[in-house]
Amino acid sequence: MIIDTTEVQAINSFFRLESLKEVYDIIWMLVPILTLVLGITIGVLVIVWLEREISAGIQQRIGPEYAGPLGILQALADGTKLLFKENLLPSRGDTRLFSIGPSIAVTSILLSYLVIPFGYRLVLADVSIGVFLWIAISSIAPVGLLMSGYGSNNKYSFLGGLRAAAQSISYEIPLTLCVLSISLLSNSSSTVDIVEAQSKYGFWGWNLWRQPIGFIVFLISSLAECERLPFDLPEAEEELVAGYQTEYSGIKFGLFYVASYLNLLVSSLFVTVLYLGGWNLSLPHIALPFFFEINKAGRVFGTIIGIFITLAKTYLFLFIAITTRWTLPRLRMDQLLNLGWKFLLPISLGNLLLTTSSQLLSL
């Protein structure tokens, strides 16, 4: 009887330890995800504030100044306002598609952050097809916009959804061809490998210098994918009121608002990763990675430096995107499609052909 009791106690202790280990593993898995979500949230708030301040400077007016110091809490005030607004549904629309559309758009963009390396060994999912996984995931977002436009039962919303789908298809192909050229140069489709392939010669090792044509095409295609001026035809106020967002209010409208900035941040991060060397300091002949690997404190410091460098390069592209918004006029729909199919697609195909030829000759 004593032996049986001892065995039962040992088994119970073993199961308790196993349960604690499972809980610990779950917590350890959730910590980086929650940290990434917190970082993304802060990044979006900073982008909104920067856009308001830069736009005010370009237009020679005063930007937000009442919501917190220097108006830095303006985005938080806007989000709170949208959160407490009434959530209206169209009486004759498809309420299921109407409600699911914004969620699909936001979720597909959020999943793109899984393959982005923010620093040395700081990525949630280092998969061998990282860049193409991003393209596949981001291709789902236009489906959500089309569902939103169709479910609204509004001609302006439906036309805006159709424009969003057509625009995404037109510019997704040149963007994919540019990414394929980068993969050929790096001999890998992993985002981490692409960054490390640019670290050999510092600043001169960036793909920006080896792929200048691809960089310009990728830049234009990224702006078009984000539906930023001069490519904001799905939301053209003068023609479509607000496009696929016309019938939305409250938190659902806020989701579209967040999705646009999330997409802009994703595009900026991928410009940094694919063309600007990612987390690398970009100074040749300086063995900083070796210095950062000396001890644990060095690794932590190196990770922080890498995150700072990545974000600095990212916000440089964001500044260009925001400045472009107030510099160039909106294109017509035919001009937008002609630019994508008649100019960017042949140029990106030619760039891919040149890259493939150079790689074959170097073998």
UniProtKB/Swiss-Prot annotation:
Disulfide bonds: none annotated. The keyword Transferase does not apply. It is an enzyme of class 7 (translocase). It catalyses: a plastoquinone + NADH + (n+1) H(+)(in) = a plastoquinol + NAD(+) + n H(+)(out); a plastoquinone + NADPH + (n+1) H(+)(in) = a plastoquinol + NADP(+) + n H(+)(out). GO terms for biological process: aerobic respiration; photosynthesis, light reaction. Its EC number is 7.1.1.-. Pfam families: NADHdh. It is a multi-pass membrane protein. It is found in: Plastid, Chloroplast thylakoid membrane. GO terms for molecular function: NADH dehydrogenase activity; oxidoreductase activity, acting on NAD(P)H, quinone or similar compound as acceptor; quinone binding. It comes from the Eukaryota. PROSITE patterns: COMPLEX1_ND1_1, COMPLEX1_ND1_2. NDH shuttles electrons from NAD(P)H:plastoquinone, via FMN and iron-sulfur (Fe-S) centers, to quinones in the photosynthetic chain and possibly in a chloroplast respiratory chain. The immediate electron acceptor for the enzyme in this species is believed to be plastoquinone. Couples the redox reaction to proton translocation, and thus conserves the redox energy in a proton gradient. NDH is composed of at least 16 different subunits, 5 of which are encoded in the nucleus. This is NAD(P)H-quinone oxidoreductase subunit 1, chloroplastic. It comes from Daucus carota (Wild carrot).
